[in-house]
């Protein structure tokens, strides 16, 4: 009877423990990071009356044991580490673990390690990351001397998590020092099409072949010793942005006065022949019959073939005056006045070899060494020099070929608006002739007329260019351009607005220059303008990809006490690829330009990423990884010892803590501005309360029943 009594008592005690455990679960239904427990019931030692026996061969069968249980007990309280719900908070230092793992905290700043799932952290007055109970969170902290200004941007977002754990402490007054720019990367297209959407006037050139007085909008004079910037005429555009696209041998004729020839005509001649500019002219005239003089007949015969010779005849008293004003496009046959075969009859006074040459052919060539003797040009300076030379020969024959530009009376320049300009200088007491300029296009059986080039140069046409009077100018010539700007940072954190200008210099060639504000200087800049670097070169492949560039870097001296020279790599793309600069038939446009420098900045705010990295946001717009929270996981989470305050300690049955970063090993991820709720399920807990209550009540019945039986036994004595 005593067995049943004590079994009931044990049952009541066990269910009391279960009630305590479940009540504790319910009490912590709103405790952050709490993990509920359950009572593990086991039966107690049984009293064996008879042991079990095995069957005997040809005898009795086997028998089970005869034993009586002695009640129930609680063997353990099992902690259930299932995932709790994640709830959002407005606190940036709140952390929640999604998956396996525990935060590592210490009550003595790193000597002792405890563990928790409760990520309700905050910074104390010294910048330490602590729990609400004052335990310091453990992890890895960025080296104080490493402020991220020397490595890559990727390195700045990482913390070395291979070292020993530290107390996470962040200086509230942290300052990120400035980082000097050492790289500019750019993605852009430079228009390779027939029409340029962005243009600028070509560089100015002076009549003395000297150099620019300033390096940004060059106006050339004789006061400096810089190299003159001449441009490939074939790569230029007219003022509307239409590309000239000059082909080999395309060009123009320019005359500086009309070709003229005056000859006597024999009036009595009837059969007359003459060869002008390679065209044979003949007529038969009997003035008695036609009542037309040989003078008029000769004029009519010459004018009848004007479209083949370019020559028009006029009556000048009893003489014939021939004139070629260079109005017709064409080849040599339409220019000047050249008697190629002696005349007969009325033309008897025209001798073979008579000529008046005033029109000069200027033809474009791709060669870098054009032959000036035959009027070849490639650059703006080549053409300027040819026009100036020939204009002075026509106007001042005495100067011949040995004149000096600075002494010539005809000055040709390219002005600041990109126009070829001819000026008939006033030479004081020396009487000079006026100029009559005519421009026409060159064409032949093998060369077509470049109308855009001819029309642009026809602006030079003038009835009379008077000595000391107004100059004559062509239309504006432009080159395709594109410009962009970016702020670069020196070692002191000072911004410098750097402007990069591109201009087309050939079919697949572009030049670029770089300008920084004064007093800054660029290595390679001129003595006159040290803040301007000229001479950058870009070459593109026939598919528009970048073939190469030079130079690959700039050297910059801010002239303000910062480190100098500051080397800045120009990352404009890889050779043969489209990852940087391209040149295709598309508008010039910068898609992206960036540099890797930044100014000094104060720590303004923090947040955590999914790896538990504490990211600091600074006033300079930069983000730096300041620390990383460590996580620990165990072979047996249920073996941890609860210490209260949502804190656990390691035990022999939990196994050693395996420490590492979030998202590595079996460790879960970390969510910032979130907390993990208690995993207590009220519906389950309340149901368990009912079950425990019924169990307790049933065990109490066993006690009362045993008591009644004992009373019955006592009554037998009476």
Curated annotation (Swiss-Prot):
Gene Ontology BP term (one): bacterial-type flagellum-dependent swarming motility
Keywords on record: Bacterial flagellum
GO CC terms in record: bacterial-type flagellum; bacterial-type flagellum basal body
Source species: Helicobacter pylori (strain ATCC 700392 / 26695)
Protein name, per record: Flagellar hook protein FlgE
Similarity comment: Belongs to the flagella basal body rod proteins family.
Subcellular location field: Bacterial flagellum basal body
Protein task: A flexible structure which links the flagellar filament to the drive apparatus in the basal body. Absence of the gene leads to absence of the hook protein, lack of the flagellar filament and thus loss of mobility. Approximately wild-type levels of the flagellar subunits are still produced and accumulate mostly in the cytosol.
InterPro entries: Falgellar_hook_FlgE_sf, Flag_bb_rod_N, Flagellar_FlgE/F/G, Flagellin_hook_IN_motif, Flg_bb/hook_C_dom, FlgE/F/G-like, FlgE_D2, FlgE_epsilon
Pfam families: Flagellin_IN, Flg_bb_rod, Flg_bbr_C, FlgE_D2, LlgE_F_G_D1
Additional remark text: The N-terminal amino acid sequence was from strain CCUG 951; the DNA sequence was from strain CCUG 17874. Disruption and subcellular localization experiments were performed for both strains. The apparent pI for the hook protein was 5.1.
């Amino acid at each position: 009877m005593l067995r049943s009594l004590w079994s009931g008592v044990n049952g009541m005690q066990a269910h009391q423990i279960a009630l305590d455990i479940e009540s504790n679960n319910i009490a912590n239904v709103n405790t952050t990071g709490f993990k509920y427990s359950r009572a593990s019931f086991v039966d107690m030692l049984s009293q064996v009356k008879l042991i079990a026996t095995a069957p005997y061969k040809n005898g009795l069968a086997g028998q089970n044991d005869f034993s009586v249980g002695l009640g129930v007990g609680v063997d353990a309280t099992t902690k259930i580490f299932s995932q709790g719900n994640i709830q959002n908070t407005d606190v940036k230092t709140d952390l929640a673990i999604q998956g396996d793992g525990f935060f590592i905290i210490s009550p003595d700043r790193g000597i002792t390690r405890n563990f928790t799932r409760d990520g309700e952290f905050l910074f104390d007055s010294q910048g330490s990351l602590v729990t609400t109970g004052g335990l310091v969170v453990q992890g890895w902290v960025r080296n104080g001397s490493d402020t991220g200004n020397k490595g890559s941007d990727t390195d700045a977002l990482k913390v070395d998590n291979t070292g020993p754990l530290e107390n996470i402490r962040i200086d509230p007054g942290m300052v990120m020092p400035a980082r000097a720019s050492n790289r500019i990367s750019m993605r852009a297209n430079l228009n390779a099409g027939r029409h340029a959407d962005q243009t600028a006037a070509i560089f100015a050139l002076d009549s003395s072949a000297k150099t620019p007085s300033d390096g940004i909008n060059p106006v050339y004079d004789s006061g400096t010793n810089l190299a003159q910037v001449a441009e490939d005429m074939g790569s230029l555009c007219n003022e509307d942005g239409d590309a000239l696209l000059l082909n080999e041998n395309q060009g123009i004729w320019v005359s500086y006065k009309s070709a003229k020839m005056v000859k006597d005509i024999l009036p009595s001649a009837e059969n007359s022949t003459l060869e002008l500019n390679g065209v044979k002219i003949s007529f038969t005239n009997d003035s008695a019959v036609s009542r037309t003089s040989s003078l008029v007949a000769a004029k009519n015969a010459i004018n009848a073939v004007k479209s083949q010779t370019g020559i028009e005849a006029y009556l000048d008293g009893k003489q014939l005056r021939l004139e070629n004003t260079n109005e017709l496009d064409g080849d040599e046959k339409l220019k000047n006045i050249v008697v190629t075969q002696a005349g007969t009859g009325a033309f008897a006074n025209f001798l073979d070899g008579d000529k008046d040459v005033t029109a000069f052919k200027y033809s474009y060539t791709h060669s870098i060494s054009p032959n000036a003797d035959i009027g070849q040009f490639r650059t703006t300076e080549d053409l300027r020099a040819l026009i100036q030379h020939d204009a002075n020969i026509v106007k001042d024959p005495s100067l011949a070929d040995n004149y000096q530009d600075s002494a010539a009376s005809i000055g040709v320049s390219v002005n600041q608006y990109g126009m070829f300009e001819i000026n008939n200088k006033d030479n004081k007491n020396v009487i000079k002739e006026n100029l009559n300029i005519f421009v026409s296009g060159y064409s032949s059986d093998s060369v077509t007329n470049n109308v855009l080039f001819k029309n642009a140069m026809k602006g030079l046409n003038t009835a009379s260019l008077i000595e000391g009077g107004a100059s004559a100018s062509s239309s504006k010539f432009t080159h395709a351009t594109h410009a962009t700007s970016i702020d670069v940072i020196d070692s002191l954190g000072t911004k410098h607005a750097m402007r990069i200008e591109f201009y087309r210099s050939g079919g697949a060639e572009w030049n670029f220059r770089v300008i920084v504000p004064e007093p800054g200087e660029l290595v390679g800049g001129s003595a006159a303008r040290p803040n301007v670097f000229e001479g950058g070169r870009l070459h593109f492949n026939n598919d528009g990809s970048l073939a190469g560039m030079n130079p690959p870097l700039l050297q910059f001296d801010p002239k303000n006490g910062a480190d100098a020279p500051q080397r800045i790599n120009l990352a404009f793309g890889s050779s043969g690829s489209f990852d940087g600069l391209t040149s295709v038939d598309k508008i010039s446009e910068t898609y992206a330009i960036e540099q890797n420098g930044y100014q000094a900045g104060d720590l303004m705010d923090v947040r955590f990423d999914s790896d538990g990295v504490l990211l600091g946001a600074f006033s300079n717009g930069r983000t730096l990884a300041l620390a990383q929270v460590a996580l620990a996981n165990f072979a047996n989470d249920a073996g941890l010892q609860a210490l209260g305050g949502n804190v656990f300690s390691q035990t022999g049955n939990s196994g050693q803590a395996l420490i590492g970063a979030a998202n590595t090993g079996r460790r879960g991820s970390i969510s910032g501005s979130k907390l993990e709720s208690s995993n207590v399920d009220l519906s389950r807990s309340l149901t368990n309360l009912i079950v425990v209550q019924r169990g307790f009540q049933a065990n109490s019945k066993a006690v009362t029943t045993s008591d009644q039986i004992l009373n019955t036994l006592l009554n037998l004595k009476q």
